[in-house]
Regions:
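Active-site-adjacent substrate-binding region
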Residues: 189, 195, 199-200, 220, ...
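Second-shell loop/turn segments in exported
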Residues: 32-40, 54-64, 133-137, 169-185, ...
C-alpha cells in the first residue's frame, strides 16, 4: 500500500512537471532584453499617451471625451495588425460636474478666505445660492457617531484624517483614510448634516483638491447632501481656523448633476494563440479618468502600456502560444461597470482565462509585480524574478491584481498588478495635477517592457495551479 501511494505521488509530480515546460534561461534572458531594448527605442506608449492626454484630455465615463478615447484607441489597435479588435458595449453612469466650484472660510461676517475644493464624483449640487453653515471637524466615521445628532445636525462635517506619512506603501496610506471620502456623506446625512467637506487623499501639502468616487448608499434622494474635497493646504487652514474660532462658517457652491446611464464600451484587441488559442491572457488598464487634469497617470499610463504589450510582442517577432488580449476597461473610476461586464460576458461565453495583468498605479518607475494566487504558484512565479533584476523591476510579492480584473477571480486564474514606485503617485491622483508633463517617457516605457516580459514568461511557463 505504501508503495502504491508513493507511486501515485511520483506520477502526479511528473505529470505536474510535464505541464510546465523547462525554462530556457539563455533564450528567455535574450528575449526579455530584446523587449526592453525595443520599448526604450521604438515603443509607442508615450506617443499614444501624448494624444490621449493632450488631444482628448480627461475621460469621465459618459462624456464626449470618453467616447473619443474609445474611437482613438480602437483605431490605434487596428493599426497594429492584430487578429481581432472590437468594442464591448457597457452601460455606464453619467455624472457632470458643471460650472467650477467655489468655497471660502468665514471667520466673522464679511471676513473670508477662499480655498480650493472640488465636488466628489456622484455628489449632488448645492442650491443655486450655495451652502453656508457651521463646521464640525472629525477624524473618522467613528468620531462622527460618538458626537451624534446633537452636535452634527445643521452643520457641515469636515473629515480631516490625513494619509499616514510613515507608510512606505502609499496605497496602504490611501486605503487607510479613503472611507471618509466614499462613505462620509452617507454617514453624516444620517445625523442631520447639511454638507460634507473631505480632506484630499494626498500626502503632499498643496492647493490641488483631489476628487474621487463617493456613495450615498441607500439614502433617499431627499436626504442626500453635497460633498466636496478640499486641498490639503485648505484643510490645514480650516482646521487651524476652527481651533481658534469654533464659530467659523464654511461656504461652498457646486453644480454637479447625475443623469441616466448611457452606453459606452470596453475596447478589446487580441493576438490569437498559436498552440492554445482558447487560453486567454488579459493585460489592461482603465480608459476612463476623472475630469480634472488629463488622466495621464490614472490611468492613461496603464492604457498605453497595455496596448504596447501587444505592439512590443509583434515588434520582437514573438508569436504567443496563448491568446494575448488587451482590454481597455471603461468606468473603473465611478462604477467598475467595464470590469464587471467583461467578466460577465467571459463567463456567459465560456471563455477560459488563465492570467490577467493590470496597470493602474501610475506611469512611474516599475519596481515589480504583485500576484493574487496561491502560495505554491507564487513560488514558481517568484523564481523568474532574476530575469527582471537587470531592469530593477524584480520585486515580486503576493497581493492584489487590480480592480478591473478582480471580477475574473472566480475563474481561478492568476491575477497580477504592475507595481511602480508609489511615492509621487498621490501628488497627481484624481486632481488637476495629473497631467502629461508629469509622466517620464523612460519610466513609462520601462513599465510597458516589464509587463511584456511578464506576459512572455507566463505564456511560456504558465504555472499549473493545484
Amino acid at each position: 500500500m505504501r508503495f502504491y501511494f508513493a507511486f501515485i505521488l511520483l506520477v502526479s509530480f511528473q505529470i505536474s512537471m510535464a505541464q510546465t515546460p523547462e525554462i530556457n534561461e539563455k533564450k528567455d534572458a535574450t528575449t526579455i532584453k530584446q523587449i526592453f531594448d525595443t520599448a526604450l527605442t521604438s515603443g509607442k506608449a508615450h506617443d499614444w499617451l501624448r494624444f490621449l492626454s493632450l488631444q482628448i484630455g480627461g475621460r469621465l465615463s459618459g462624456s464626449v471625451e470618453a467616447e473619443q478615447a474609445v474611437e482613438y484607441t480602437k483605431t490605434e489597435l487596428e493599426a497594429l495588425g492584430l487578429d481581432r479588435v472590437y468594442l464591448q458595449p457597457v452601460m455606464v453612469p453619467k455624472w457632470v460636474r458643471g460650472a467650477p466650484e467655489f468655497a471660502y472660510i468665514e471667520t466673522t461676517p464679511g471676513v473670508t478666505t477662499t480655498v480650493p475644493i472640488t465636488a466628489l464624483g456622484g455628489s449632488i449640487a448645492t442650491s443655486s445660492m450655495g451652502l453656508k453653515a457651521g463646521v464640525v471637524e472629525v477624524k473618522s466615521l467613528d468620531e462622527l457617531e460618538q458626537l451624534g445628532r446633537a452636535r452634527i445636525e445643521g452643520k457641515i462635517v469636515f473629515y480631516n484624517r490625513p494619509m499616514e506619512p510613515t507608510l512606505i506603501n502609499t496605497f496602504a496610506a490611501y486605503g487607510g483614510c479613503v472611507d471618509q471620502r466614499y462613505s462620509g456623506a452617507e454617514a453624516a446625512a444620517k445625523f442631520g448634516a447639511v454638507g460634507v467637506i473631505v480632506r484630499s487623499m494626498n500626502l503632499r501639502l498643496d492647493d490641488f483638491p483631489h476628487t474621487g468616487a463617493m456613495s450615498y448608499g441607500d439614502l433617499p434622494l431627499d436626504q442626500r447632501i453635497p460633498a466636496a474635497a478640499i486641498s490639503t493646504k485648505g484643510a490645514d487652514l480650516l482646521s487651524a481656523t476652527l481651533s481658534l474660532n469654533k464659530q467659523t462658517q464654511f461656504y461652498f457652491k457646486q453644480n454637479s448633476r447625475n443623469f441616466p446611464d448611457v452606453k459606452s464600451y470596453n475596447v478589446i484587441g487580441e493576438i490569437k494563440g498559436s498552440l492554445y488559442p482558447d487560453e486567454i491572457m488579459v493585460v489592461g488598464g482603465h480608459l476612463d479618468s476623472w475630469d480634472l487634469g488629463d488622466g495621464s497617470h490614472d490611468d492613461g499610463a496603464g492604457v498605453v502600456q497595455s496596448m504596447d504589450v501587444l505592439s512590443l510582442l509583434k515588434q520582437v517577432g514573438y508569436r504567443p502560444k496563448r491568446t494575448i488580449r488587451v482590454v481597455l476597461f471603461m468606468n473603473e473610476e465611478n462604477g467598475l461597470r467595464g470590469g464587471n461586464e467583461y467578466a460577465r460576458v467571459a463567463l456567459a461565453e465560456g471563455e477560459k482565462h488563465v492570467f490577467a495583468l493590470e496597470s493602474d498605479s501610475g506611469g512611474f518607475t516599475p519596481r515589480g509585480f504583485s500576484f493574487d494566487t496561491d502560495k505554491a504558484t507564487f513560488e514558481q512565479i517568484k523564481s523568474w524574478s532574476n530575469y527582471f533584476y537587470p531592469y530593477l523591476s524584480d520585486r515580486f510579492e503576493l497581493g492584489g491584481g487590480g480592480a478591473d480584473i478582480g471580477p475574473l477571480k472566480p475563474q481561478g486564474l492568476i491575477l497580477a498588478g504592475l507595481k511602480p514606485d508609489s511615492q509621487r503617485y498621490f501628488d497627481h491622483h484624481h486632481s488637476d495635477n495629473d497631467r502629461f508633463e508629469h509622466v517620464n517617457k523612460r519610466e513609462l516605457e520601462l513599465g510597458a517592457a516589464a509587463m511584456t516580459a511578464l506576459v512572455y514568461m507566463m505564456d511560456n511557463y504558465l504555472p499549473q495551479k493545484n
